[in-house]
């Protein structure tokens, strides 16, 4: 199969025993991408935390300086003036009970959801539908707010939410393989900076343990943690 040959060729380029500098690693990921579509570049960061303990949970959001290279469909639960503010900011869908009804019927044609605090009683009705899909508005990541205009702008500009998984790993998209290496680099450094600022006080020892980067279909490339960390402002 041609696809498997392309994957083998991509794997052959990567030395799994080596940790690459951020620049070299990104160049390798971009040159190893082989899919017919424009692949997303993803980062996986292993943190020195045990998320089974509430005081070691890492969660937050960061607006990537160069965006994600894709159109983000934003839904806002709001009424009155806040509804107008959301529409003026470019929200794709704005409403209240009408949107709740659509979602209850199985409609999920949006990428992120924002709600004003007074709407959370209504939104709570569909929490079990939104939560598993990572779409539930949350004040910790700035998606439950009265400043809906700013929240919409941030989401449209490439805001990425992150949350540590059971194994202590954070996964996040940082752009497309079509991005220039410097643009991807700036996005990754912004993510790492946000993770460092989100370090729980209960976390002991080495915090950033491992960083790897890959394209959607390509192999993972291990990055030199000290090289990446030294570039975080």
From Swiss-Prot:
**InterPro entries per record:** Ribosom_uL1_bac-type (IPR005878), Ribosomal_uL1 (IPR002143), Ribosomal_uL1-like (IPR023674), Ribosomal_uL1/biogenesis (IPR028364), Ribosomal_uL1_3-a/b-sand (IPR016095), Ribosomal_uL1_CS (IPR023673)
Q: Which GO terms describe its biological process?
A: regulation of translation; translation
**From the Swiss-Prot or TrEMBL record, what is one GO molecular function term?**
structural constituent of ribosome
Keywords of this protein's UniProt record, alphabetized?
Repressor, Ribonucleoprotein, Ribosomal protein, RNA-binding, rRNA-binding, Translation regulation, tRNA-binding
Residue ranges that the Swiss-Prot or TrEMBL entry lists as coiled coil:
none
Q: Name one GO cellular component term.
A: cytosolic large ribosomal subunit
Top-rank taxon of the source lineage equals: Bacteria
Which PROSITE patterns does the annotation name? RIBOSOMAL_L1
What CDD domains does its record include?
Ribosomal_L1
- Family per record: Belongs to the universal ribosomal protein uL1 family.
Whom does it interact with, and what assembly results? Part of the 50S ribosomal subunit.
Job of this protein: Binds directly to 23S rRNA. The L1 stalk is quite mobile in the ribosome, and is involved in E site tRNA release. Protein L1 is also a translational repressor protein, it controls the translation of the L11 operon by binding to its mRNA.
Designated name of the protein: Large ribosomal subunit protein uL1
Q: Which organism is it from?
A: Geotalea daltonii (strain DSM 22248 / JCM 15807 / FRC-32) (Geobacter daltonii)
